[in-house]
């Protein structure tokens, strides 16, 4: 298994980029109605909180894809998704310990993934490595 250790930074970069790409789609769906509409085709989301969430998701995801300010962006995104889980899913439907019952499993998973990036950093192929060398 020690032979796999040399690939850790590259897998971490791959995971970071894929998760950020998947998450940016949530932001564009809220803010731009792309690739799907979150309002049933009735124009951009009118709820100011959803618009703010969409901007945070787009900007944060771009930073993660680039690997720039990775830990800070991941922290903000983790807090956003924890907020979504506790104050939207749990508060709306209950079932704190059963995310599948309140529809919050995706929010909880994203929150934990972003929290992982807070502690692990960006991995390989990140602008953080170029601009903020130790």
UniProtKB/Swiss-Prot annotation:
Q: Does the keyword Cell membrane apply?
A: yes
Compartments where located:
Cell membrane
Question: Pfam families from the xrefs?
Answer: DoxX
What keywords would UniProt list here? Cell membrane, Membrane, Transmembrane, Transmembrane helix
- Quick one: a GO cellular component term? plasma membrane
Query: How does the protein associate with the membrane?
Result: Multi-pass membrane protein
User: Mind telling me which residue stretches traverse the membrane in this protein?
Assistant: 9-29, 49-69, 107-127
Q: Which residues does UniProt call coiled coil?
A: none
Under InterPro entries, the record lists: DoxX, DoxX-like_oxidoreductase
Q: Which PANTHER family match?
A: BLL4328 PROTEIN (PTHR33452:SF4), OXIDOREDUCTASE CATD-RELATED (PTHR33452)
The similarity comment for this entry is: Belongs to the DoxX family.
For this entry, the protein name equals Uncharacterized protein HI_0886
The species this protein was found in: Haemophilus influenzae (strain ATCC 51907 / DSM 11121 / KW20 / Rd)
The organism's taxonomic lineage, starting at the top = Bacteria, Pseudomonadati, Pseudomonadota, Gammaproteobacteria, Pasteurellales
């Amino acid at each position: 298994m020690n032979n796999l250790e040399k690939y850790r930074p590259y897998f971490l970069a791959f995971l970071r980029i894929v998760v950020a790409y998947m998450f940016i789609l949530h932001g564009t769906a809220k803010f731009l109605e792309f690739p799907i509409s979150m309002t049933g085709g009735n124009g951009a989301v009118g709820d100011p909180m959803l618009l703010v969430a969409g901007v945070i998701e787009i900007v944060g995801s771009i930073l993660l894809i680039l690997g720039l300010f990775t830990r800070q962006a991941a922290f903000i995104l983790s807090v956003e998704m924890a907020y979504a889980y506790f104050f939207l899913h749990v508060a709306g439907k209950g079932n704190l310990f059963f995310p599948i019952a309140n529809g919050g499993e995706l929010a909880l998973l994203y929150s934990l993934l972003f929290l992982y990036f807070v502690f692990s950093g960006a991995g390989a192929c990140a602008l953080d490595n170029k601009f903020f060398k130790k």
